[in-house]
Amino acid sequence: MAAPMLRLGFPGRRWALTWLDGGSRHRSGSQTGPTSNWARRQSSVAQPSLHTAQKPRKGEHKWAAVVGLEIHAQISSNSKLFSGAQVCFAAPPNSLVSYFDASLPGTLPVLNRRCVEAAVMTGLALNCHINKKSLFDRKHYFYSDLPAGYQITQQRLPIAANGHLTYCIYLGKKPSQVTTKTVRIKQIQLEQDSGKSLHDDLRSQTLIDLNRAGIGLLEVVLEPDLCCGEEAALAVRELQLILQALGTSQANMAEGQLRVDANISVHHPGEPLGVRTEVKNLNSLRFLAKAIDYEIQRQITELENGGEILNETRSFDYKLGCTMPMRDKEGKQDYRFMPEPNLPPLVLYDDTSLPRGADSQQVINIDQLRDMLPELPSATRERLVQQYGMLPEHSFALLNEVGLLEFFQNVIKETRTEPKKVTNWVLNTFLCYLKQQNLAVSESPVTPSALAELLNLLDRKAISSSAAKQVFEELWKGEGKTAAQIVSEQQLELMQDQEALEKLCQTTIDGHPQVVMDVKKRNPKAINKLIGLVRKASHSRADPALIKKILERKLSL
């Protein structure tokens, strides 16, 4: 039997629990981004837009943009923040809902230790001050996917505050022109996620799935230190990498594990800040950048035409490429914050304040968690540059694709090829094939061992560079053959017979007197042409370096 789905009809807005089958042909989701497998892997690829938002041209209008972000990251935990219900993205609707999640009378919250540890580790990684005492509050508002009518959050005294995030930004067209910028972090707070509403326009109904209700969230509030969509996207991407390195959140935007709200305003430099608008629920980095840049340009255009900016909430229509008004915020909503009466203050300790004889399972030690912090992305990039001598932009590329750094390091372990060549093959060949077929690293038919074997053959000069590319193409077919087998079957080995190479070179010299004449005139292109003719005659099995030596000797160059 299918799992139950809460159905909420519009007319009377009454709750009713009904059994629905697995079909949902006419159900339209509330997500604003792509949900296909292709789109999940290619979150950076936007759909064609009808309205193109251009970045404000600096100096022409003399406008300054101010952008602040509120980032909601779903905590990686086995159970929810205040209940024992399991966390699973793909579970059937309403199959992972405890009595507390459904807000049945008499149920009480029990704080999840793992979520607190995740918040502390994230705060430490983001250079925040960890508050040894933090408080929980109720934030009241009515929405159909929030059964209790309030959300448990940390409005008064959050678990972490006053941090900063350093991210890198490209100054020009060349990838090597990289600089770092810093955005301040106002606070990090623990809070509950809400359920999910799926709007059925055909039947004028809203379907409620409470599987997500009560999952632990980290809300990271960035100060308005950003000025454009590109900066915002790069800052969020760096935060995403940090969360994934810590293991505190999978931060998969396609699955709603990382959602961003952007607060945007424009003003003339030296004047007070303008009226801000909030763009909600941006679920991809590309859409985040496009939405912010569009909204900046929209506000500038509105003000220059004599209009005014409303303090409103907007959404981003990824199909049209523009923001649309959702609801007016002029009449500021009163969330009626109040202390959560069912949760005592959250008290943390460090080595200096830890009570003597305290049970480690009953307390959380900040210093102990600090010692458990893994290598963060910035340190990893610096290590890659120093250890392997790679360019900074290459270290960024290795970390930017999930699983690519691990793939690279596994290849390095199994080959004696110099790291620069391995980097070149991983980024320019392997990654190119992945992108062409929209595959994740984990889905690649070429394993690190297979690529390492191919590079070893190339390093020993058993095959040429062009032959290596042929072998890689065969490996990509995933037929289970090794690189050595492919080389043997297709006779791609370099010619080792010196006498045969001598004859081949002499035959080429005799057959192309005009090219030989050009070579003797010191035409640099002519010698390369002659080498190419010899390689063609050898079916690309002759070593170009060896051919060049033989030709130079024969032609007395």
Swiss-Prot record:
GO CC entries: glutamyl-tRNA(Gln) amidotransferase complex; mitochondrion
GO MF, one example: ATP binding
The keyword Protein biosynthesis is assigned to this record: yes
InterPro entries: Asn/Gln-tRNA_amidoTrfase_suB/E, Asn/Gln-tRNA_Trfase_suB/E_cat, Asn/Gln_amidotransferase, Asn/Gln_tRNA_amidoTrase-B-like, GatB, GatB_Yqey_C_2, Gln-tRNA_amidoTrfase_suB_CS, Gln_synth/guanido_kin_cat_dom
Keywords: ATP-binding, Ligase, Mitochondrion, Nucleotide-binding, Protein biosynthesis, Transit peptide
PROSITE patterns reported for this sequence: GATB (PS01234)
EC number: 6.3.5.-
Domain of life: Eukaryota
Catalysed reaction, written as an equation: L-glutamyl-tRNA(Gln) + L-glutamine + ATP + H2O = L-glutaminyl-tRNA(Gln) + L-glutamate + ADP + phosphate + H(+)
Compositionally biased intervals (Polar residues): 29-52
Alphabetical GO biological process terms: glutaminyl-tRNAGln biosynthesis via transamidation; mitochondrial translation
Span of the transit peptide along the chain: 1-30
A Pfam family of this chain: GatB_Yqey
Modified residues (N6-succinyllysine): K529
Residue segments, region Disordered: 21-58
Localization per Swiss-Prot or TrEMBL: Mitochondrion
Alphabetized NCBIfam families for the sequence: gatB, PRK05477.1-2, PRK05477.1-4
Binding partners and assembly: Subunit of the heterotrimeric GatCAB amidotransferase (AdT) complex, composed of A (QRSL1), B (GATB) and C (GATC) subunits.
Family membership: Belongs to the GatB/GatE family. GatB subfamily.
Role description: Allows the formation of correctly charged Gln-tRNA(Gln) through the transamidation of misacylated Glu-tRNA(Gln) in the mitochondria. The reaction takes place in the presence of glutamine and ATP through an activated gamma-phospho-Glu-tRNA(Gln).
Protein name: Glutamyl-tRNA(Gln) amidotransferase subunit B, mitochondrial
